[in-house]
Amino acid sequence: MSTEQQTKASEVSVREPNAPWLKNYGDIPFHLEYFKGSMWGKVEQIIAQYPDYIAYDFMGKHTSYRKFGRDVELCARALKAIGVRPGDRITICMPNCPQTVVVFYAVNVVGAIANMVHPLSSENEIEFFLRESGSICAITLDQFYHKFEAIRQNVELSNVILASIK
């Protein structure tokens, strides 16, 4: 970190006249250094450095960064194979589960835009979000497919992809 980035709140001077709260930060740095690349770029860096570390634990099952990275790349290839291109909007309507994380990063790898929709949203809400976002594809869990089936004729989706929790 540069000297300026290491400045502590206790050293606040006239350089930060519009941030009077910084004097209350104590020894906590108020300038942080952030990764300059993409979200996936940072994950790739972590995969390279710590391939065997646990990326996530879901219902007692641990998944390494190596496997997580392979899953994301496989999903990204599948999205490209069905015609998803950079800039396309993809609705992800899934709960907090590993499939959601994999799909989210795969969408980023492709260069598409993730439109996150809560899976407990009503059919009308999902239809609204699909229209508003201009999504060309939706990804959801099999248990929520009935919501998409009910509105599919009202929206322009080239694909509805189903995942399941095993």
Task: Locate predicted features.
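Short, flexible loop segments at the rims of nucleotide/cofactor-binding pockets, characterized by
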Residues: 31-34, 67, 114-117
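Structural core segment of the AMP-binding/adenylate-forming
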Residues: 2-9, 109-166
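Flexible, non-catalytic linker and terminal segments flanking ANL/adenylate-forming cores
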Residues: 1-36
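Short polybasic/polar patches that bind polyanions
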Residues: 48, 80, 108, 131
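A structural signal for short coil/turn segments at secondary-structure junctions
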Residues: 50-51, 83, 133, 155
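AMP-dependent adenylate-forming
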Residues: 16-19, 41-64
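Conserved AMP-binding/adenylate-forming core of the ANL superfamily
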Residues: 35, 52-97, 101-105, 122-127
